[in-house]
């Protein structure tokens, strides 16, 4: 069946850039920048739906479920990017947030021919993860019609998982398979059909909110500090110290001493200082309160 791509918003021509190939470099970039400014406004219109998705993801995490991103091309890469940043930022397990791309790891760096049209692959990739009703699947596709993603969404519904659609074309096929529909309509691209641009930026903004919101609601943030950050390099070791200082008001030396006493776990160090607990007591309190510092301090 032939698909009429010209009917899709993401495939339409943008009047603002029809003569972009004739413009001086600075004027060319001004056109791109002006179009980019429309993206955040489009995302703002979807915030109620994004909030629903954040609540669903946080609930899944609390019940031992996972967040699975699924996309092809740029959409798949954006999901993988967001998923890969969760462990170092929030100390989460790598299997808690997973990014799938049509064509597998090879497709991260190089296009895999026909992978996005492979429905069987969409289902088999999720079956390999043993997707269950505890999980949340976010299907990502600028067009909203990618067969790989739609097949995955169909399968996710069949096992009772919560399904979210993230696309940039209103009324797209993906919406029919979703419990929650997020559709930032960013309009035509500067280069016709190049959905890695405005559509990709909109997707990235939404993905940022999904994981950030869910991690905040899971107790991974105290104030605006990433208190579960892992010390995997020199920069992050210093960040841990800074976080404890900011959260407690003690000196860097005192923060370092607390971190050293608890195996460099920011939450434990903060609770030790603010609550006057030993490392063991602080760790126990965090366990009792599911990792929420405020609850452990009875500040809720």
Swiss-Prot record:
Keywords from the named record: Carbohydrate metabolism, Lyase
Gene Ontology BP terms: 1,6-anhydro-N-acetyl-beta-muramic acid catabolic process; amino sugar catabolic process; N-acetylmuramic acid catabolic process; peptidoglycan turnover
Coiled coil residues, start to end: none
Catalytic activity: N-acetyl-D-muramate 6-phosphate + H2O = N-acetyl-D-glucosamine 6-phosphate + (R)-lactate
Taxonomy, superkingdom: Bacteria
Keyword Glycoprotein: no
Catalytic residues of the enzyme: 85, 116
Pathway: Amino-sugar metabolism; 1,6-anhydro-N-acetylmuramate degradation; Amino-sugar metabolism; N-acetylmuramate degradation; Cell wall biogenesis; peptidoglycan recycling
Keyword Repeat: no
Function according to Swiss-Prot or TrEMBL: Specifically catalyzes the cleavage of the D-lactyl ether substituent of MurNAc 6-phosphate, producing GlcNAc 6-phosphate and D-lactate. Together with AnmK, is also required for the utilization of anhydro-N-acetylmuramic acid (anhMurNAc) either imported from the medium or derived from its own cell wall murein, and thus plays a role in cell wall recycling.
Subunit (UniProt): Homodimer.
Record family assignment: Belongs to the GCKR-like family. MurNAc-6-P etherase subfamily.
Note: A lyase-type mechanism (elimination/hydration) is suggested for the cleavage of the lactyl ether bond of MurNAc 6-phosphate, with the formation of an alpha,beta-unsaturated aldehyde intermediate with (E)-stereochemistry, followed by the syn addition of water to give product.
Protein name: N-acetylmuramic acid 6-phosphate etherase 1
Natural source organism: Vibrio cholerae serotype O1 (strain ATCC 39315 / El Tor Inaba N16961)
Gene: murQ1
């Amino acid at each position: 069946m032939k698909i009429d791509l010209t009917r899709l918003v993401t495939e339409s021509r943008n009047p603002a850039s029809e003569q972009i190939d004739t413009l001086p470099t600075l004027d060319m970039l001004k056109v791109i920048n002006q179009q980019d400014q429309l993206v955040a406004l489009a995302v703002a219109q979807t915030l109620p739906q994004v909030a629903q998705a954040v609540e669903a993801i946080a609930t899944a995490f609390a019940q031992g479920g996972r967040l699975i991103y699924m996309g092809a091309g740029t959409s798949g890469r954006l999901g993988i990017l967001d998923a890969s940043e969760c462990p170092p930022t929030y100390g989460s397990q790598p299997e808690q947030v997973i990014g799938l791309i049509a064509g597998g790891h090879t497709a991260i760096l190089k296009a895999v021919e026909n992978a996005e049209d492979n429905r069987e692959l969409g289902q088999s990739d999720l079956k390999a993860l043993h997707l269950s009703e505890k999980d949340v699947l976010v299907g990502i596709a600028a067009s909203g019609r990618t067969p790989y993603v739609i097949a995955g969404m169909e399968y996710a519904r069949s096992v009772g998982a919560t399904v979210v659609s993230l696309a940039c074309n209103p009324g797209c096929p993906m919406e029919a398979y979703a419990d929650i529909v997020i559709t930032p309509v960013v309009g035509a691209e500067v280069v016709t059909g190049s959905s890695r641009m405005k559509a990709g930026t909109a997707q990235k903004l939404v993905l940022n909110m999904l994981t950030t919101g869910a991690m905040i609601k899971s107790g991974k943030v105290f104030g605006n500090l990433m208190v579960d950050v892992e010390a995997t390099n020199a920069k992050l070791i210093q960040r841990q110290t800074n976080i404890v200082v900011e959260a407690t008001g003690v000196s860097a030396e005192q923060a370092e001493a607390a971190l050293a006493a608890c195996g460099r776990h920011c939450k434990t160090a903060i609770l030790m200082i603010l609550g006057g607990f030993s490392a063991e007591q602080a760790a126990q309190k965090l366990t009792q309160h599911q990792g929420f510092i405020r609850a452990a301090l009875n500040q809720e």
